[in-house]
Amino acid sequence: MRTQLFSAVIAVIASAATLGLTASPASAQTFRAEIHGGWDHVGDDVNADGLTYGIGAGVDFRLAPRVNAGLEANLDFSTADKCGTSVLAAGDALCIDARRDLSAVARVGYEVSSNGQVYALAGYTNGRFRIDYDPANGPAVRTHENLDGLRLGAGYQHGFGNGLYSKIEYRYSNYELGAERHQVIAGLGIAF
């Protein structure tokens, strides 16, 4: 099931790239780079809240008079960490510490005004987490896990002129092993 999901995500990203590569000269591409940050919530057996911050870069293509498609990559870090007791067994302790998150997504936007667009996104994400587990009656274990997942999201991007823009975005990530992430971020960037 997960293999089919990742195959579908790769197909969507490849299709968006193909659309951009075959765009007519009148629908030139726009490159962009940004910084962003906001709220991060990671949940599974232990829920952790914190801040996320990072950078992103992408390219957008005009598909129709008010419709854009794009590809973007992000590198984010998180301060979300939390410990819980009696999570898997009585007296145990489980701590989760969210680390970096890499993502590659495709997005489709619709211009709601001359300066603003709403958009939806979907793609691949890979989160790194540090997990500490103390079973209370045995040796403690520390491990770092890289978890693959699916990212979905939606947002609004507003241009201020001279290529400057801001955005607000909601992201949902569903990783292997049942881990989930919810993020609300704001970003500032430049398109060129």
Which residue stretches match the model-derived regions?
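Terminal low-complexity, poorly structured segments
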Residues: M1, S15-A17, S27
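Gram-negative outer-membrane beta-barrel domains
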Residues: T3, T22-F192
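Bacterial N-terminal signal peptides
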Residues: S7-G20
